[in-house]
C-alpha cells in the first residue's frame, strides 16, 4: 500500500465534519473542485468508494477506518505539541465521546468537571442509546464510548465501569389513577409509558419479560431525554424505567414510587477507547473509569 497522504485524509475529514463539499472547501481555504479532486484521488488510491453520497453523507467501512486513523493521529499530534511547547498558547483540544443519555444525566459530567476546569477542552458529546454508542467509535466519530457491550473493537481497549440499576417508577397520583388494583395486564395495556426512541428496546423487553406485554400492546411516548423521563414521571404523565442513581432523592421523599420492587433492570456499562491514547485523552479515560466505578454498582 502506498503511504497515506494526510492532505487527502484532511479533505475527507472536512467533508464528513461539514457534511457539505462547499463548506469543507471553505474550511480548508481551497476550491470546491480541489476538495472533490482530493476525495477522488483518495478513492483511486484504494480503488473503492470512501463516501456514500447520501443525505447525510456517510463514510463507507473503509472510509470509517481511514477517518478513525486520521483522527487518532491528529489528536496525538495536538497533545504532543502541548508537551513539547507547554508554555505556548494551545488551541482547545476537541474531544469527541459517545455516551448514553442516562450516564450523561448522572455521573458522566461530574467525572470530567475537574479536567474541563484545568485544560482547554472542547467536548463534543454524541448522545445515543447505550446499544449504539460503540458504533461512533467504529465509524471514527469518537475516540471513546460508554457502552453496554463488553467486547473491544480492533485497535481499542475496554474497561468495565459497573452496573446501572433501573426501576419502574411513577408518581403516587399516577399510580392511584391508573393502577388502583396493581400492575395488571389490563391496566398496563392502556396506561402510557415512555421509551427513549423507536429503536429503544429496554422498556419493551422489560415489559415483555415481566408482564407478558408485546410491543405495540400499550401506549408509549418517545422522548430522547433522560431528564424528561424524570419530569414526565414526576408530573404524573407516564410511568417509565429510570436509573435509581438519578432519582434517589425523589424515592426517599415519596415523589416517585418503585412500581415493581421485585423486578429491576440491570445494565452493565463499559468504557471503550483507542489503544493509542496519551496525555489528556488518557486522563479522561482514567477519570471516567474511576468515577464510573464509584457511582455505579459493582458488576
UniProtKB/Swiss-Prot annotation:
It holds the Pfam family LysR_substrate. Residues 4-60 form the HTH lysR-type domain. This is HTH-type transcriptional regulator ArgP. The keyword DNA-binding applies. Keywords: DNA-binding, Transcription, Transcription regulation. GO terms for molecular function: DNA binding; DNA-binding transcription factor activity. Homodimer. The lineage of its organism: Bacteria, Pseudomonadati, Pseudomonadota, Gammaproteobacteria, Aeromonadales. Residues 21-40 bind DNA. Belongs to the LysR transcriptional regulatory family. InterPro entries: ArgP, ArgP_gammaproteobact, LTTR, LysR_subst-bd, Tscrpt_reg_HTH_LysR, WH-like_DNA-bd_sf, WH_DNA-bd_sf.
